[in-house]
Structure formats: C-alpha cells, structure tokens
C-alpha cells in the first residue's frame, strides 16, 4: 500500500532529547503571520502551538489592532505589527527556519494584495493555513507562486474550496496526493484523522 499509519513508534524515531547545556538559539527561529480585527485568537493559538512544538524563538507579524490581545495571550513571543485592522504589507527582513501564514489573517483586498506581493519574492517553503488557503482558493493564479516544499494544512471545506469536492474520503485522499505532487507541496489533511502527503519521501501517512 502507498499509505502508512503514524503511531507512537513512528513518532519516537523523530523525537530528540534536548541537551542540558543548550539554549533557545539551538532550537530554531520561526515567524507566524496572521490575525485581523476580531480574529486574533487564531494567530494566538497558532503561536502557542508553535512554541509548544519546541521552537526556540518565535516572532509574529500581526495588525496593530491586535497587539495587546496577542501579547497578553502569548507573552513568550516577539511581536511585529503592520496595518491597523488587517495586515497590508508582508516583509521578511531576517532569516527564519520556518514561516507560517494564514491563521485569522482575513481575505480582505489589502491582505490579498499583500500575500500576492509576498509570494512573488518568497523562495522559502511556507506553512499555509486557514485564510491563506482561502485566498488561494479565490486567486488560483497564485498557486504557481507557492515555493516548492511548502505545507498546506486544509480542513475538508478549505480543501474543497481549493481543489473541488470528492465523492468519498478515499477519493479525496487520492486527489490530495495528486495535487501535492502537481504543486510540489506537502499536503496535511486536517480532520478527526489526519493524512500527510510528504513530497520529499513520496509517502502518505495516516494518523489515527
């Protein structure tokens, strides 16, 4: 079968114990881009998940309306602001090991323009979620700008908006795998169970 299951033994192979004399600089530098007026919880929860996942340093780019909310939710994170109620420009002026974009970012005209401009110059693989995917579903001409090796994390409805519906869940898995290959991305299907289509290893993993 082309499908494998993820269990505790699988995860143990990736687990790395932290060295006693290490520091935050040894564990990566991440940037999260998202949030808008009324949707700051999404980027806040995503930032918490990023820190929980083990990143050493994390910055967030958010609109200024959410600064106080975000810093109260995630005091461990550093914070950059752009725009008042929505992000209007996305500029990355330093090196990051990982960049995530989309949670709560909105699909406003200014944000769509900001994402399109960012994708035209970005060469680094991205983790794209939520409204970043909703923007791509409306502006499919942007799909060819997605950096190779990026990660999409759609739930079922976000996936349907991007790639169309499937008759059943098995066909959706096959379709998601084909789209991952076509776009040179890694496709992480959210739901009660998760399906991961990894481009580099050409494998499909099911998390039960």
How does the language model describe each region?
Residues 1-126, 134-151, 156-208:
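Small-residue (G/A/S/T)-rich helix-start motifs and N-terminal tracts that mark the onset
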């Amino acid at each position: 079968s082309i499908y494998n299951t993820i269990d505790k033994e699988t995860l143990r192979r990736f687990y790395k114990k932290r060295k006693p004399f290490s520091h935050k600089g040894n564990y990566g530098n991440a940037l999260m881009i998202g949030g808008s007026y009324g949707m700051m919880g999404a980027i806040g929860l995503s930032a918490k998940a990023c820190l929980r996942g083990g990143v050493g340093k994390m910055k967030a780019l958010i609109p200024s309306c959410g600064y106080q909310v975000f810093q109260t939710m995630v005091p461990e994170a550093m914070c950059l602001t752009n725009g008042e109620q929505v992000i209007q420009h996305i500029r990355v002026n330093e090196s990051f090991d990982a960049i995530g974009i989309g949670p709560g970012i909105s699909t406003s005209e200014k944000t769509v323009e900001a994402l399109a401009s960012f994708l035209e110059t970005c060469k680094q693989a991205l983790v794209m979620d939520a409204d970043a995917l909703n923007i791509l579903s409306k502006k499919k001409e942007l799909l060819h700008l997605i950096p190779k090796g990026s990660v999409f994390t759609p739930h079922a409805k976000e996936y349907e908006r991007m790639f169309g519906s499937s008759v059943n869940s098995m066909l959706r898995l096959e379709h998601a795998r084909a789209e991952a290959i076509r776009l040179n991305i890694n496709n992480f299907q959210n739901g009660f169970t998760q399906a991961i289509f990894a481009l580099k290893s050409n494998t499909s993993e099911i998390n039960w």
